[in-house]
Design a protein with these regions (language model features):
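Radical SAM enzyme core and accessory elements
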Residues: 1-120, 199, 415-480
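A C-terminal junction/extension of Radical SAM enzymes
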Residues: 29-39, 360-435
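Short beta-strand motif preference
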Residues: 52-54, 166, 280-282
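Short, glycine- and charge-enriched coil/turn segments that flank and shape catalytic ligand pockets
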Residues: 61-63, 68-75, 119-124, 209-215, ...
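N-terminal [4Fe-4S]-dependent radical SAM core
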Residues: 90-97, 117-164, 213
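Canonical Radical SAM [4Fe-4S] cluster-binding loop centered on the CxxxCxxC motif
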Residues: 161-196
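Beta-strand scaffold of nucleotide-dependent catalytic cores
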Residues: 167, 281, 349-353, 423, ...
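Conserved non-cysteine loop/helix-boundary elements of the Radical SAM core domain that shape
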Residues: 182-383
């Protein structure tokens, strides 16, 4: 779908909205007038008024809209909203309103969290989403509830606090829906020990920097990939290094992402718990064995239940379980049954993801038929009803590009069990110091900006460039 800008260069703001509203139409930026399908976003800047117009033609039908904004009120955010709202109104002549209205970003809760922190009531924050951004009442309510959990989690933070993420970029196999840069253990098992050697060097160096800077670690998250592809002995070595080199005495949450149930056994779960971890994530994605096989996950629903019971026996304070709505071969009835089985286990947290068709994933090639957007909407609505009935509330929420139906991912929790790292990371509430291959450190600057530092993506690159990684950590901590 062609996109022509006239009188402005806010391409990103308009492009992201076009991708969200017309995900099935390939994006084609142009600089010259055209005929046929496409969109034109125009802005005329006068002495007193800014006038935005949008005209969208698709399959022989055309939608048009025009809006104005006083020049005196036209700061950068207001101008972008003007362009997006004008484009949105033109698009609504051609399609049904989406659940998230004109919002195209991945963190819609930032708007409502800011509103609550500024003293607005939950009702006023909901109204902001509905009236300014055309968000549906249902999504507005979810957003505000997640923001209320964010405000509560913020009360645990102190100025010197940071969170630490440790990445293990290895998996047993690659799932069909995943684009994460991880290495299959079947092919790269020889890299595990050298990778741990390099990672422990980064851990030790980071511990020195944390002490020198006076920073304290509030939450610690070991993710991946699948960290539990490591053996029990390797997990003990990693976690002992963390305990030795980094002061963990002021942690309020320690999570390990077990992920694939087929990588979990009693020995690993007991080892992880004995090293101080209190929160375990076990992610079936579905409890339908046929769907599991279709997406390349080599485990069964029975293995998920067994891993959960082993985690309970090991004494974890909280267990999270993930499900994905929209997997190939799934349908609303099957998804509801997966959730029923998960709720019967009674985990403290349930995260309901919406399938995102990521460009690096096997599913992106389109070789498998996926549930319709209407089916995904039914899955999510049914999940919300079941989770609320079971006593869960939303505690964090985010969106991704190319999601089925342009919906969202939501973390649900029982009272008092919100996953704090997830909130702090997703809401960018404080600096996240990240270690390992593919990890990204985010430093929150005093002026509100974020400075990002990327580690090499692939394990072999990480090993070869570990000295550069340590030097980059020095640069990051100079900003803290």
């Amino acid at each position: 779908m062609k996109l022509l800008l006239r009188g402005h260069d806010d391409r990103y703001a308009v492009e992201q909205l076009q991708l969200a509203l017309f995900p099935e139409e390939p994006m084609e930026p142009v600089t010259e007038p055209f005929s046929g399908d496409g969109a034109v976003s125009s802005l005329h800047t006068g002495a007193l008024w800014l006038t935005a117009t949008a005209e969208i033609t698709l399959h022989g039908k055309t939608g048009r809209a025009c809006r104005r904004l006083r020049a005196a009120e036209a700061d950068v955010p207001a101008r972008r909203r003007l362009l997006q709202n004008t484009y949105y109104e033109a698009a609504m002549c051609l399609r049904e309103p989406p659940a998230w209205g004109s919002l195209s970003g991945v963190r819609p809760t930032k708007l409502t969290t800011r509103a609550l922190l500024e003293g607005k009531t939950p009702a006023e924050a909901e109204k902001l989403l509905r009236t300014r951004y055309h968000v549906s009442p249902e999504r507005s309510r979810l957003c505000v509830e997640a923001s209320e959990a964010t405000v509560q989690a913020a009360q645990l933070l102190r100025p010197q606090d940071v969170s630490v993420y440790v990445g293990i970029p290895f998996c047993p196999t690659r799932c069909a829906y995943c684009s994460f840069v991880s290495s299959s253990i079947e092919r790269f098992s020889g890299l595990l020990e050298p990778y741990l050697d390099a990672l422990i060097r980064e851990i030790a160096h980071t511990g020195d920097l944390l002490r020198a800077s006076g920073r304290t670690v509030r939450t610690l998250y070991i993710g991946g990939g699948t960290p539990t592809t490591l053996s029990a002995a390797q997990l003990r070595r990693l976690m002992e290094a963390l305990r030795t080199h980094i002061d963990l005495t002021e942690l309020v949450e320690y999570t390990v992402e077990g992920g694939r149930p087929d990588t979990l056994d009693a020995e690993k779960l007991e080892t992880i718990a004995s090293m101080g971890c209190g929160r375990m994530s076990i992610n079936p994605q579905t409890m339908n064995d046929t769907v599991l096989a279709r997406v390349g996950r080599r485990h069964t629903a029975a293995q998920t239940a067994a891993a959960y019971e082993a985690a309970r026996a090991a004494g974890y304070d909280a267990v999270n379980m993930d499900l994905i709505a929209g997997l190939p071969g799934d349908d609303p009835a099957s998804f509801a049954d997966s959730l029923r089985q998960v709720l019967a286990l009674a985990p403290e947290n349930v995260t309901v993801h919406t399938l995102a068709l990521k460009k690096g994933a096997d599913l992106y090639a389109g070789r498998m038929e996926l549930p319709s957007a209407d089916d995904v909407a039914q899955m999510l609505a049914g999940a919300e009803a079941s989770l609320r009935a079971a006593g869960y509330t939303p505690y964090y929420l985010y969106r991704q590009k190319y999601m089925s139906g342009s919906f969202e991912n939501i973390g649900w929790c029982r009272p008092g069990t919100a996953g704090l790292y997830n909130i702090y990371m997703m809401e960018e509430m404080h600096s996240i110091v990240s270690l390992g291959g593919g990890a990204m450190t985010k430093i929150n600057l005093p002026d509100g900006r974020l400075e990002r530092f990327h580690n090499p993506k692939f394990p072999q690159q990480y090993l070869e460039r570990i000295d550069d990684v340590l030097a980059q950590k020095d640069a990051a901590f100079r900003l803290l």
